[in-house]
A protein has these predicted regions:
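Nucleotide and nucleotide-moiety/phosphate-recognizing core
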Residues: 3-8, 14-18, 23-85
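A short glycine/serine-rich beta->alpha loop
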Residues: 11-15, 90-91, 130-131
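Conserved active-site and cofactor/substrate-binding residues in soluble primary-metabolism enzymes
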Residues: 20, 24, 45, 96-99, ...
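Glycine-rich loops and low-complexity Gly/Arg-rich segments
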Residues: 32-35, 64-68, 89-93, 106-108, ...
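Helix-loop-strand module that forms the ligand-binding subsite of alpha/beta enzymes
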Residues: 70-114
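Phosphate-binding/catalytic loops
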Residues: 101-181
């Protein structure tokens, strides 16, 4: 099977400071024991466009996508927002190399449940290289992990494990997620 039932994509480039948020969340999430039907992918840069296109043409049963990336929604650095594809007008969501991601997301939204978790960046240094997240964005990673686990309907244990919970919650639209623990 090429994809699992639930796919989590971490998007971004760690060479441009806070743009590395998605890949950092993916690395942290890989420390957890997740349900067998969940696939976690560091989609990097530009890759999301191709992955979404491939998935749209695939017969494999992907039911849910969780997309983790930075998003400038006017919040405080490190603040999280949970968005649906309908919150993204066509042409508004682009990666740093100008791949339009809104259109592939809209193409998939009628057959795949898509949630976007965006983190307000403090700094994105493109074209200059700067490795490492700002303190505010780094501090948002634990809350992002908890939000992902909540979306998946799992609770995490004390040692980086996760176990299945039978909750089935779903929210629509933009909602900000407080970053305090």
């Amino acid at each position: 099977m090429l994809f699992e039932e639930i796919v989590i994509f971490g998007c971004g480039n760690p060479l441009f400071a806070d743009d590395g948020f998605g890949p950092e969340v993916v690395e942290e999430l890989k420390k957890y024991k997740l349900p067998d039907n969940v696939k976690v992918i560091d989609a990097g840069l530009g890759g999301p466009h191709f992955l979404f296109t491939l998935m749209a043409q695939s017969d494999e049963p992907v039911k849910k996508i969780i997309l983790i990336d930075i998003a400038d929604f006017g919040g405080e650095p490190g603040q999280l927002a949970r968005l649906s594809v309908n919150d993204l007008p066509p042409g508004t969501y682009r990666d740093p190399h100008s791949w339009g991601l809104t259109e592939p997301l809209h193409m998939l939204k009628d057959r795949i449940d898509i949630t976007i978790i965006g983190c307000q960046p403090k700094r994105v240094t493109e074209p200059d290289f700067e490795i490492g997240l700002s303190d505010e964005v780094q501090a948002a990673i634990p809350k992002t992990i908890q939000t992902i686990l909540d979306i998946l309907g799992v609770q995490h244990g004390t040692e980086g494990t996760a176990f299945k919970d039978l909750r089935n919650e779903r929210e629509e639209g933009i909602s900000t997620i407080p970053c305090s623990n």
